[in-house]
Amino acid sequence: DGLYGINNINRFLQNSNPNESVVWGINTYKVGDPILFNESNIFSPLIHNNSKGKIFGIHPGEQEIQFDIELEESINEIDAWEYDFELIGESEAGKSIISFTVSKYRSTDEDDEDNNSSVVPFQVAYAVSIHKAQGLEYDSVKIVITNETEERITHNIFYTAITRAKNKLKVYWSPETEQSVLERLEVKSSQKDAHLLSQLSSLTMEN
């Protein structure tokens, strides 16, 4: 994972969240944590893989834990009718809040091959991989590129990363890594791509 790996960055940023920690299994959760629903597809297709949200409430018990999640979008009771969660209201921002429980132990029902009762269907996502960020947009994006990862940064990967930001973008890299990455990028014939890369060549590390 490395010092600047996704797991370490997530732990570091979560530590700045002042809300109480709730440990469940091997993971730690806090109210206010940003999350991404993952590949378990428990609530698919209404809530699909990589849907964004935020932990709105956590209610741990001895045998199960209840999560209240603020979604990025608004859904109604008809939309939620057939899914294994409860639509409990809206946040002040007008976003839907759903509630569901996760069991501490997996069901022993051998006839239920698709039992997901003990699966937490999301991951804490202060930081995500560039691959995971495809199709997502954020108001502010910070990209960390180290000398250990610079060789894997192709034109397409770099373009995907920098176009996730709607308003604010920062790239954290050393001058040597910056030069190495930009020299190896294959600038496509598109004038838009070329202009974007020329703008980024002036980016420097910010503390």
Residue ranges of predicted features:
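Core RecA-like ATPase module of SF1/SF2 helicases and allied nucleic-acid translocases
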Residues: 1-207
